[in-house]
């Protein structure tokens, strides 16, 4: 998913993407809803990682890359940029770092873990037990 590293997705966006993914997987497998096969079963059968998990991995991978950059790099400067001026009325837009912070919390990662590439990659890929893995197992049982 090119560019998904920088998307700040809302819950509705994720649900639409998952719905579309499930529809495409059913079409590829030649399975209809009448066949009463779960989408998770089809994903496991085909060896496909759920699209929301793939986007999470891409987002956290990009965050680790940005964190390891030097402070003088333009990417770090853009990340730490503070925009001055009055903000509009109403709720602000969801920020990319909010998504990353939620992902790190779900996987039990800390911001400092990004400096050690092996720890960071292991946490993203699920090579160590995390809270998100337990939630995934619970979803598969249903």
Model-inferred region functions:
Residues 1-142:
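Short linear motifs embedded in intrinsically disordered, charge-biased segments
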């Amino acid at each position: 998913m090119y560019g998904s590293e920088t998307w700040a997705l809302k819950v509705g966006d994720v649900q639409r993407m998952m719905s579309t993914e499930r529809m495409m997987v059913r079409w590829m497998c030649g399975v209809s809803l009448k066949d009463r096969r779960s989408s998770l079963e089809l994903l496991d059968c085909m060896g496909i990682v759920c699209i929301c998990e793939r986007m999470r991995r891409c987002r956290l991978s990009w965050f680790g890359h940005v964190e390891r950059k030097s402070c003088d790099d333009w990417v770090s400067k853009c990340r730490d940029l503070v925009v001055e001026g009055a903000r509009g009325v109403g709720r602000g837009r969801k920020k990319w770092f909010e998504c990353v912070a939620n992902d790190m919390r779900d996987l039990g990662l800390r911001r400092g873990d990004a400096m050690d590439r092996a720890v960071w990659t292991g946490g993203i890929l699920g090579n160590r037990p995390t809270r998100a893995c337990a939630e995934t197992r619970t979803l598969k049982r249903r």
